[in-house]
Amino acid sequence: MFRRSTLVLGTALALSTAAAYSHHSFAMFDNTKESTIEGEVKDFQWTNPHIWIQVNVKGSDGKVQEYSIEGGSPNGLKRQGWTKKSINAGDKISLKMHPLKDGSPGGSFMSALVNGKTLGRNVAEEYPAAPAAK
């Protein structure tokens, strides 16, 4: 009986280790830098394992560039008060992020001001004039 229990436990541990290692790294983001973009939400994807926000940003030359922003898990964000309707296509957004190291248009979500509501970490410090999200 002991041998069988040990075999079952060993198999379970081996399988759970593979799942833990399958989660990707955030090494592609430069966590020493912060940048802010302003634009219009093209798409908001409330999906596991991470949410994605596509934002169209108009440059000084008038050309629109699409940014892809990776956020936290829907489960974690729901505990912070988010819903799948917190951000919608067409919303005006000011978004703070850690940019991609390679300079591509994208980053890791930090916080945002969306239609007068704040979302994310340390929003009181980053957007002091904005009301807290409900």
How would you describe each model-predicted region?
Residues L100-V123:
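OB-fold/S1-family single-stranded nucleic acid-binding modules
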Residues Y21-S35:
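Short boundary/loop segments of OB/S1/cold-shock single-stranded nucleic-acid-binding domains
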Residues L119-K134:
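Extended, charge-rich, solvent-exposed interface segments
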Residues V8-A18:
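Bacterial N-terminal signal peptides
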Residues T47-V57:
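Short aromatic-glycine-enriched beta-strand elements
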Residues I37-V41:
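Conserved hydrophobic positions within beta-strands
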Residues M1-V8:
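Bacterial N-terminal signal peptides that target proteins for export
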Residues R79-S94:
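Short nucleic-acid-contacting surface segments enriched for D/E, G, S/T with interspersed K/R
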